[in-house]
Amino acid sequence: MKRQLYLYVIFVVVELMVFTTKGYSQTKADVVWKDVDGVSMPIPPKTHPRLYLREQQVPDLKNRMNDPKLKKVWADMIKMQEDWKPADIPEVKDFRFYFNQKGLTVRVELMALNYLMTKDPKVGREAITSIIDTLETATFKPAGDISRGIGLFMVTGAIVYDWCYDQLKPEEKTRFVKAFVRLAKMLECGYPPVKDKSIVGHASEWMIMRDLLSVGIAIYDEFPEMYNLAAGRFFKEHLVARNWFYPSHNYHQGMSYLNVRFTNDLFALWILDRMGAGNVFNPGQQFILYDAIYKRRPDGQILAGGDVDYSRKKPKYYTMPALLAGSYYKDEYLNYEFLKDPNVEPHCKLFEFLWRDTQLGSRKPDDLPLSRYSGSPFGWMIARTGWGPESVIAEMKVNEYSFLNHQHQDAGAFQIYYKGPLAIDAGSYTGSSGGYNSPHNKNFFKRTIAHNSLLIYDPKETFSSSGYGGSDHTDFAANDGGQRLPGKGWIAPRDLKEMLAGDFRTGKILAQGFGPDNQTPDYTYLKGDITAAYSAKVKEVKRSFLFLNLKDAKVPAAMIVFDKVVASNPDFKKFWLLHSIEQPEIKGNQITIKRTKNGDSGMLVNTALLPDAANSNITSIGGKGKDFWVFGTNYTNDPKPGTDEALERGEWRVEITPKKAAAEDYYLNVIQIADNTQQKLHEVKRIDGDKVVGVQLADRIVTFSKTSETVDRPFGFSVVGKGTFKFVMTDLLPGTWQVLKDGKILYPALSAKGDDGALYFEGTEGTYRFLR
């Protein structure tokens, strides 16, 4: 009964999101919304052009040709009209060949554009006759992601059809439509486009959100089926899913695939808006790319996330999504990101010419708040100490849901960068092991063991990977001791309904916040329950992160990580992981990780306070032959020649394990960040109160509930030391608390808010008591 009620609630939520989609848009008067097969969608207006621009935008085309900021784009397109030289044509034409657009398709697109401006019938007719035969006869040999090339070819045909519409003869319209349907049936998503997934996968890229949508709009008057099918699936599945996660201001496909996946979301935005439907997306879409802004390292690289490869010779840019989002939302921060590398790929240059806002200014991120939170369904936090070369960057993750595909099983993971990658995501997407479904990818790189998270090792646990796509298919992946593989055999959800009804929930955000100044916070806090990320081998797993901006040139930052891990069997061994590039040094309860190569000079020193020294085993694993070690097997993945010069895929990890078998264990680790030449760090003291455990470090006092449960009763502890301390007390019941020091009222009423359950105040040494 509870399960049925839960599924009913999911159905209502999804249907409500479909219903409210129209509420985001400002539809033009000649665009009406209709219900088609149970899906509400905007209908293309009875006018041409309506694809990528309307009649009111046509007069501006000549101005854009003379715009100084678009002159190079126009010159590039003129040059792109030249055919490929035979010697330059590869033997196997994959999508990259077609995306490096040249020749016929560019010529006819520019003819169609010229026709819009001049209305010269000869030009319009030439565009039509130049492309129609090729549309009918073109063949595409199977090759990597060839649907992208087929779809781009369809886009060219759609441009000619829509922009030269009044020059088309009735029989030519029929020929175009038949050719489009023929090509659509070659696409990976099929025609009707019902194959693959709408949240992740190739059907969440060009095929539906640009290619079929474009053709459907162009030919709607003569053949409404294609638009109804493509737009029907888009509004029922693609849009609903995105409007569900967009309010979090983040994306789920990692820092490489963010580029292509989000670009196509934005193509759908522009296509429908220019058609006249307005913005159908949740306005949170504007802020998705801010994640990349916050993860931008001082060396120009991006903090790793999801399926990525490394090369310091090639900084990571988000040219097209930054252009599309920046110009649409008039966002100067995004335009600044675009201008880092304004070299748009050939197949998108026409869209830069049509859509780029050349009057938009640019703005550095220097005045943005230093911490950024991404809420449900993610639960991610980024904390920085600044925007310059001395900046520390820390990432903290809960992962309320696992979207799979290019997202990893990394609930509870963290990363730290300072003058080089210190606490890293290990492994890499491609290399000597292969690609998406390589042994390295599915047994190490995508798995919890490759991240700074927690393992609970049940030697009998199995991990079904029978649904995981790609070559090198296996029914099972290695037992890494980590988080379960959601879905049936690790297959991603098709749509939002399947995601919410399935087993893709992996965590819950328990608390988050930063302050006391939101612009330059002293602390940044995130806590999550990630029990659901694991199988029944665990009863409870909670992790708290607290990042401290120490505002000290010598030791600029620290991060405290507190964990509660309860296994279903006390014999299941627990592991606290810390990954690095260079070999760590272990002395007692201290772990030192340095960057000494490739121009890097940062250092991380971790002090393990829990488990107690007598119950703590700290070891390192790594070096050639054990760099990607998974309980007896090394999943080697050497970089391709000329890539990963700094070995950012890593080679070492530290494991902290309790010596004594127990169902319940706690970890408390204090990480200080400094230059690798810094000799003196802050003393780290553990605080033990009657209901709390915590850390005294520099001028900071931080506490957590000893049991990781909410503290709702009076408690206390003592502080010894000189000067004034800044206190951050977490895990408190929201509401008013009174603070006593040495038996006297220090603060008669301090409020712990509901979102973070934390108190922040200042005080000196003494005995503190906290009352409700």
From Swiss-Prot:
Keywords: Glycoprotein, Lyase, Metal-binding, Periplasm, Signal, Zinc. The active site is at 202, 257, 406. NCBIfam families: HepHepsulflyase. GO terms for cellular component: periplasmic space. Glycans are attached at residue 134. Homodimer. Its EC number is 4.2.2.7, 4.2.2.8. Residues 1-25 form the signal peptide. This is Heparin and heparin-sulfate lyase. Belongs to the polysaccharide lyase 12 family. Cleaves both heparin and heparan sulfate glycosaminoglycans through a beta-elimination mechanism. Cleaves heparin at alpha-D-GlcNp2S6S(1->4) alpha-L-IdoAp2S and heparan sulfate at alpha-D-GlcNp2Ac(or 2S)6OH(1->4)beta-D-GlcAp. The gene is hepB. It is an enzyme of class 4 (lyase).
